[in-house]
Amino acid sequence: SHKGKVIAIENQNSWTDGGVAAPTPFYWSTNGYGMMWYTFKKGEYDFGATEKNVVKLSHNSSYLDIFYMVNDGAVALLNDFYQLTGNPVLLPKFGFYEGHLNAYNRDYWKEDEKGILFEDGKRYKESQKDNGGIKESLNGEKNNYQFSARAVIDRYKSHDMPLGWLLPNDGYGAGYGQTETLDGNIANSKSLGDYARQNGVEIGLWTQSDLHPKEGVSALLQRDIVKEVRDAGVRVLKTDVAWVGAGYSFGLNGVADVGRIMPYYGNDARPFIISLDGWAGTQRYAGIWSGDQTGGVWEYIRFHIPTYIGSGLSGQPNICSDMDGIFGGKNETVNIRDFQWKTFSPMQLNMDGWGANEKYPHALGEPATSINRMFLKLKSELMPYTYSFAKEAVDGMPLIRAMFLDYPSAYTHGTATQYQYMYGTDFLVAPVYQKTQADEKGNDIRDGIYLPAGSWIDYFSGEKYEGNCILNNFDTPIWKLPVFVKNGSIIPMTNPHNNVSEIDTVS
């Protein structure tokens, strides 16, 4: 509920609690109506903050152009919005697995006892400037394999961790090749793509500049999205503020361009675009990423839960954020809890290389390695379930659902259930988002879990609970996420696996 709040409908590039990363000039009410402003101008929606029980909406426009929707229920009103702006894209299957993002074509690695431990048993520190160390590359062809993008794929495999896709150029000035020509660099990207696909992983590219060739741009930073998709096999695109940071129509036109190119030149590949600075219509082409934040703190988990819920209510069901943040980290408990709850979300971005700490699921050692693996494997097992409800979100309920959508009441219409949600129709997920009575190992309890009327089964213990109650002191040892299944549900699952190519389609 936005009651009593003022919501900025503008591209702020503010990525903390209360900030705006991807505004949408649309809202709807459980009273059976919705409104969408037909504008790209900044706005402000006041839901009774300055005058009780009065909603005041405004945009910095000299004329009034609004669509009104009158309909019964969330699905009908969301579909009215989709009729005007386009239905949400259904992500390709590999997009529901963890993605790893970093730059592997720019930096130098020099031995340093305080650095990151590599496979050769030595520690190295990374520098964007030539420090006399070993320069990285995508394919490890320069006696630098452990610093290459290929080594990332090997690393996930050696730790038995699921990995769906890899972005090897996520960093300013990185590019994806070290030759003197754009075509030479595209061939370099294709070589990585061939290796990745042999291992069940797709590749993508991060974008800081124009996607089409431009005169006067060096080969390193030159782009040709058509050749990248057609020749190198690129199947993911992630935008950033340097390209779509202006937002509004500029950002929307950018993702729309790629949304058309990827299937046309990519053998009918389903577009997988991750963007920010969105607007009404972004959902037609892209999923939303919440921006750059600091992990290792409880606040990072806390504010993302209602963010994910609210995104779906706003017609943007494909929502994601970085695993344990792009910066910070090294808090084992927070790291584990973030991997746990995002098992029950669409996308997972492991954003490595921007901060001082590694961002692999195994980076913190045991017990984090085993617990994170357990939940990544669970996410893979749930692919039939997740994909079914992701398909439903194209013209129905979002995958991550506010409690009031399926269980409307005075209690769920407020903020009392903002830290739990339904994942599809059958899973109730109540993430651990704060320290309550934790011991030194992170074992804790979870208070305030609302179970609607009916019978609910603790997914991990099998214990049965009768609903229409609030659970307090729910035991949450470090390995356990509070997840409940509606009694009588049939959950389609598959074998635990590491990428789409390993799904058992026979048994």
Q: In which residue ranges do the predicted regions lie?
A:
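Beta-sheet entry/capping signal
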Residues: 25-26, 32-35, 65, 93-97, ...
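Gly/Pro-rich turn-and-neighbor structural signature
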Residues: 130-158, 162, 183-187, 195-200, ...
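Aromatic-lined carbohydrate-binding/catalytic grooves of carbohydrate-active enzymes
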Residues: 89-255, 262, 283-284
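Secondary-structure transition/capping motifs at alpha-helix termini
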Residues: 157-164, 187-204, 227-237, 259-271, ...
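Catalytic core of carbohydrate-active enzymes
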Residues: 260, 282-288, 307, 311-321, ...
